[in-house]
């Protein structure tokens, strides 16, 4: 029942071309073992069972084709400001929005100011006071609608990036589904762990990311000093260098995790 609830939650995210394909049912032709859903957090289940689009074409926010063929595309909304780190922000915010846990939707801007959606819904907005950003109440409202949520995300995606995620999210020595690999910088890069499998005691991970210009969240692969990539799943063994889309991540140093997994 828990899995079904999470899957339904993911499936109703606003987008087009909804299909029954999910991250979890990507075909693996070699002997990687699927991990059980038992013991996974709600957040891990949400990502693992997130729906994929029927098409593997990658498009930008305006519908222009970026890539004719890919490993797969996550079935979620894309806006004009949704790049790189914003893909992780989108998934994390959607997770709590559909659970109506609005107080858990909160991100810190690059300047360090935390902006909760629960405050935004009550009419608070980011304002500059001297040389400092603050949250100030500018209107009397109680608006948790999808349209207001999207307006909130537009601001968050504009002022939150790889540098602030690298700074603000906790480190983790043990990567899990839903965790991030983060190169904080201007620009930096962020990739999301969307699935995990095992073979002979080694953990293999599948990743996704977005890019510039703002575009679909695409399933991606790469190489690892931890061993051979198997059917697009990348091994991580202790201190490992992973290369994806030309970016080099070091584990565990670049692993970031989210608080509130359930």
Where are the regions that the model predicts?
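Sec-dependent signal peptide recognition
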Residues: 1-7
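C-terminal motif of bacterial Sec signal peptides marking the signal peptidase cleavage site
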Residues: 12-15
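Cationic-aromatic interfacial patches
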Residues: 17-82
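Extracellular-facing segments of soluble proteins and assemblies that are Gly/Ser/Thr-biased and enriched
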Residues: 81-170
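Substrate-binding/catalytic groove segments of enzymes
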Residues: 97-101, 190, 199-203, 215-218
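...with weaker cross-activation on analogous glycine-rich loops/strands in unrelated enzymes
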Residues: 143-203
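Low-complexity, Gly/Ser/Thr/Pro-rich intrinsically disordered linker/tail segments
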Residues: 206-262
């Amino acid at each position: 029942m828990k899995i079904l609830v999470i899957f339904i939650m993911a499936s109703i995210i606003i987008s087009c071309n909804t299909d029954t394909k999910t991250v979890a049912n990507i075909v693996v032709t070699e002997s990687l073992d699927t991990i059980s859903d038992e013991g996974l957090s709600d957040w891990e289940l949400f990502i693992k069972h997130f729906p994929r689009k029927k098409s593997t074409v990658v498009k930008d926010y305006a519908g222009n084709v970026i890539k004719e063929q890919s490993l797969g595309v996550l079935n979620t909304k894309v806006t004009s400001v949704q790049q790189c780190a914003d893909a992780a922000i989108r998934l994390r915010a959607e997770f709590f929005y559909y659970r109506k846990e609005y107080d858990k939707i909160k991100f810190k801007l690059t300047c360090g100011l935390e902006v909760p959606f629960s405050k935004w819904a009550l009419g608070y907005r980011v304002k500059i006071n001297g040389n400092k950003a603050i949250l100030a109440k500018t209107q009397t409202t109680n608006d948790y609608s999808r349209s207001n949520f999207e307006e909130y995300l537009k601001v968050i995606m504009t002022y939150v990036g790889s540098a602030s995620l690298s700074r603000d999210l906790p480190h983790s020595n043990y990567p899990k589904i839903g965790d991030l690999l983060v190169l904080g910088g201007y620009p930096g890069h962020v990739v999301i762990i969307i699935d995990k499998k095992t073979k002979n005691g080694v953990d293999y991970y599948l990743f996704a990311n977005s890019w510039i210009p703002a575009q679909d969240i695409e399933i991606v692969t790469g190489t690892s000093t931890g061993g051979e990539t198997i059917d697009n799943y990348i091994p991580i063994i202790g201190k490992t260098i992973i290369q994806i889309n030309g970016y080099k991540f070091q584990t565990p140093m670049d692993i970031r995790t989210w608080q509130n997994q359930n």
